[in-house]
């Protein structure tokens, strides 16, 4: 695992021992908009690997075969990540390597939005009811896909009408698939940014590209 400090371009003090996302070809200065995607962009442009995967500082995948109780948001929760958790969820190089070498892509389990606290009936409705989110942004992304990637339009609409989606922008992908996904994703998001005035968005609303990417990951992998 390689720790990356995101948004490094926005601060003068950095986390010792971490790679910063503001080296080489990067979008670090846009971290308030693109969230964890600035790390993914950095890895895409600057890191050569056989597989690429992303966790958050407080979110990880479970690599064990065991099922554990879920909270109302369908997540497994722990007070902190410690040695017990590392063992419990098989968070070690050997277990991760054995799994990822078997598949082209590893994702978190799909979450059913109808079982979350807000009880939305579809992925589209969940976004529409999201705090600080604007459904016009998701509609614009649909229009962009219709122009740039029409072969994905039916899939996009199927995902939006459905109840299941993968959230949090976490995954592990084989190199070729990762590069394809990054090119596809940022081609859509950069076009969205070009067409959208977010100057009056709230702090959370300004993170819209990150929120959109969560839904787009499901579309790409569908």
Predicted regions and their residues:
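ER/Golgi luminal nucleotide-sugar-dependent glycosyltransferases, focusing on the catalytic module
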Residues: 1-222
């Amino acid at each position: 695992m390689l720790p990356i400090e995101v948004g490094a371009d926005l601060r003068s003090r950095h986390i010792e021992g971490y790679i910063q996302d503001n080296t080489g070809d990067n979008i670090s200065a846009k971290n308030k908009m693109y969230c964890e995607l600035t790390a993914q962009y950095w890895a895409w442009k600057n890191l050569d690997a056989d597989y690429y995967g992303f966790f958050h500082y407080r979110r990880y995948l479970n690599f064990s075969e065991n099922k554990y109780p879920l909270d109302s948001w369908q997540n497994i929760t722990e007070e902190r990540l410690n040695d017990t958790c590392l063992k419990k969820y098989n968070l070690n190089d050997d277990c991760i390597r054995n799994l990822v070498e078997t598949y082209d892509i590893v994702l978190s389990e799909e979450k059913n939005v109808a079982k979350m606290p807000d009880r939305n009936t579809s992925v589209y409705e969940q976004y529409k009811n999201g705090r600080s989110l604007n459904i016009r942004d998701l509609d614009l992304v649909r229009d962009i896909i219709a122009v740039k990637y029409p072969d994905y339009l039916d899939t996009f609409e199927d995902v939006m009408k459905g109840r299941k989606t993968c959230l949090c922008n976490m995954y592990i992908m084989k190199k070729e698939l990762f590069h394809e996904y990054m090119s596809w994703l940022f081609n859509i998001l950069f076009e969205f940014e070009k067409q959208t005035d977010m100057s009056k968005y709230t702090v959370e609303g300004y993170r819209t590209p990150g929120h959109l990417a969560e839904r787009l990951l499901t579309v790409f992998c569908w």
